[in-house]
Regions:
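Glycine-centered recognition micro-motifs in short, flexible terminal segments and loops
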Residues: 65-66
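Eukaryote-biased recognition of intrinsically disordered, low-complexity regulatory segments
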Residues: 1-7
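Short amphipathic, charge-patterned alpha-helical segments
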Residues: 16-26
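Short alpha-helix capping/helix-loop boundary micro-motifs
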Residues: 41-46
Length: 66
């Protein structure tokens, strides 16, 4: 299936959840915000939220600082 992650086209094997995609991208499960088709996906739903062909994701890593 074809998805877009942070503006870049990407192939993913279906079915795949947000949590599985984060793992494939080598991103932590905590400290990231995920938006799918302009809707925030709460972290509590990452393991169940199934991505669909054509989904557009924005993944943002949260960084603390001062």
């Amino acid at each position: 299936m074809n998805i877009i992650v942070n503006g870049e086209p990407r192939q993913a094997t279906a079915p795949i959840t947000v949590a599985q995609l984060l793992s494939e991208l080598k991103l932590p499960q905590r400290g990231v915000a995920v938006e799918v088709n302009l809707q925030i996906v709460p972290r509590a739903q990452h393991a169940e939220y199934q991505l669909q062909d054509g989904d557009r994701l924005e993944v943002v890593s949260l960084v603390g600082g001062g």
